[in-house]
Structure formats: C-alpha cells, structure tokens
Regions:
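A short glycine-rich, His/Asp/Glu-containing loop-to-beta-strand
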Residues: 36-40
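Charged, amphipathic alpha-helical segments and their flanking helix caps
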Residues: 1-32, 44-150
Length: 150
C-alpha cells in the first residue's frame, strides 16, 4: 500500500495556468516575491478518511482513502489605496478561475482516482500571508482527492 501524496502534488504543480507558477511540496519559497504563485499550505493534507472495502490483513485489504489538499494563491503584495484593491480583486478573480478551470479539465490524473475542488474550494479571499508573513492579496484553494489502495 502506498498513498500518492507526492505524486498528486507533482501532477498539480505541472498544471499550466497562464501567468501563475504552481509549486510542489518540496518547492515552497520562503517569500512571495515571485507572484502570482500557488503554494502548498503548511496544513497541506486535511480531512483524511479511510474506508475499508474488504476484510483481511491491512497489507491486502482494499481501501478507499479520501483527503483534502490545501494550497494558497499569492497574487500581488497588499498595498494602500483603492486602485490597488480594485486591481487585486480583478486579477485575483481571474487567476482563481484559471486555476479551477485547469483542475476541472484534467483528463489524466496521476496518483489518484479523482481530484475535484472541495465544496468550499475557495476560502480566505482577500489579504493572506506568504511564508515569511508578508501580506498579499490571495486566497486558499481546497482540492478533494480519492484513492483506491491495495
């Protein structure tokens, strides 16, 4: 049995989203200076659930595993003034749409059986922090994964 956290993270990082860099779990920068960028959150894996599909010893029993992968979009550095806010919200909304379109259009998903935006796929839209705590306009994305193991 092997869960595919690294494989699906690689698959998501390889998505093509116009004007956005997507980082893998081993590529998270210490700052958000190369924006727009999508990075895994520190609580990258949440809502882990395991359902046994058959009985038997753990190494051979069929199981369905579901979990949520959490990412943060850093769009532009937060600044003062109304024009910065309007520019940020327009551009941020566009990048959110492009990323979700790319996820929904994945014909081949390496590592999992299914990958879809969560029910609450977008949270914290507005001011978010980069890894170094600098403030950016951005949001968090949540993607639900489903794997069959063994």
């Amino acid at each position: 049995m092997a869960l595919s956290f690294t494989t699906i993270s690689d698959t998501i990082a390889a998505l093509s989203v116009s004007g956005v860099t997507i980082k893998d779990i081993d590529e998270v920068p210490t700052s958000g200076d190369r924006v727009p960028i999508i990075i895994p959150l520190p609580d990258f894996i949440t809502n882990f659930n395991l359902d046994n599909m058959t009985l038997g010893v753990p190494s051979t029993r069929l199981m369905t595993v579901s979990y949520t992968l959490n990412y943060r979009l850093l769009f532009i550095r937060a600044g003062a003034g109304r024009s910065n806010t309007i520019e940020a919200l327009n551009g941020l909304t566009s990048k959110i749409g492009l990323f979700l379109d790319a996820v929904l259009a994945m014909d081949t998903i390496t590592g999992v059986e299914d990958l879809v935006p969560s029910t609450n796929a977008i949270t914290n839209m507005g001011i978010v922090n980069a890894p170094n705590d600098d403030a950016y306009y951005g949001c968090d994305f949540h993607l639900d994964c489903l794997e069959h193991v063994n």
